[in-house]
Amino acid sequence: MGILEKIKDIEAEMSRTQKNKATEYHLGLLKAKLARLRQQLLDPPKSSGKGGDGFEVLKSGDARVALIGFPSVGKSTILTKLTETKSLAAAYEFTTLTCIPGVIQHKGARIQLLDTPGIIEGASQGRGRGRQVIAVARTADLILMMLDANKGEIQKRLLQEELESIGIRLNSQPPNIYFKLKSAGGVNLTATQTLTKITEKLAKSILHEYKIFNCDLVIRCDPTVDELIDAIEGRRSYIRCLYVYNKMDHMSMEDVDRLSRQPNSVVISCNMNLNLDFLLDKIWDYLNLVRVYTKLRGASPDFNDAIILREGATMEDICRFLHKELVSQFKYGIVWGVSAKHCPQRVGISHALEDEDVIQIVKK
């Protein structure tokens, strides 16, 4: 029996099994088997074949955003609207057959936007170009899930299932679980709080399903079975996602209002250029980028040349960005902006910067 058949059998058994206290142990083991089989399906073959067809795109710019969606939902159109790249768009499906990059210029940042081929149901199991598309999604800092507003909820559920099944977790954080394999000593399981969703017996059985008999497992949260499996697998991507409902010009105002109030959602119309500026601002917010401006002593800062960093960046990050030897030469920094308690403020190398701060670096 092949892997796909085993996956289908387990999924069928899970759908037949009523979920209650008596069956949660059995369902937990089934979930572990299912996750292990799906990972086997995704692992690349060891044999080397001919080179690829150029589907992968070199990462560039300050951040990467991937467009994911079913065929003919407006991915190519929005790439053309937000960037200077022309991606073939048509009213029929599967217009885009490879990955097409573009660059969004917004607030001084260069954001790489990737238009991927339309996903079809079963993509995670290899249908269409699903595996390549999902591999690109793993490398993104943000996923824009493009949805047809008239079919949005159905498409959203199917795409979430496809991404979840191959280890992409949308708008969530990794569970606070420490896991480390050992060569001997058995399973050392420690929970720092009461476990209400799994038992110690179930946790050890899931480990045994993965042929793990020696490890340290420290659980600092109250995880579900799925979260425990994620920690054991270790190959999970936690990526922020914006649900972009296109074709709002074909909807009633009541439906537009309802969709726009949903978490992590934006309603737009590519054809009529509605709400595209708001979408750009949302992309900026979700990428957690900050702009930092530098100045020389006695000179004014150049507000047309920002250094783009991640939220939480420090003076040390700025030094490394400017020159690798600047960290060792750093004496102190002077900061004007939101992060300063008073302007200007003399700061150390660990000082955290905020958006639109102005800095001056003084060397030893």
From Swiss-Prot:
Query: Per its UniProt record, what CDD domains does this chain match?
Result: DRG, TGS_DRG2
Name the GO terms of the biological process aspect.
Answer: cytoplasmic translation
The TGS domain covers: 288-363
The alphabetical list of record keywords is: GTP-binding, Nucleotide-binding
Q: One Pfam family name from the record? A: TGS
Stretches assigned to the OBG-type G domain: 63-288
Q: Name one GO cellular component term.
A: cytoplasm
- List ligand-binding residues for GTP: 69-76, 115-119, 246-249
User: Does Nucleotide-binding count among this protein's keywords?
Assistant: yes
**Gene Ontology MF term list:** GTP binding; GTPase activity
Record's signal peptide = none
Name the family the entry cites: Belongs to the TRAFAC class OBG-HflX-like GTPase superfamily. OBG GTPase family.
Q: What is this protein called?
A: Developmentally-regulated GTP-binding protein 2 homolog
Q: Which organism is it from?
A: Dictyostelium discoideum
Q: What is the lineage of its organism?
A: Eukaryota, Amoebozoa, Evosea, Eumycetozoa, Dictyostelia
Q: Which gene encodes it?
A: drg2
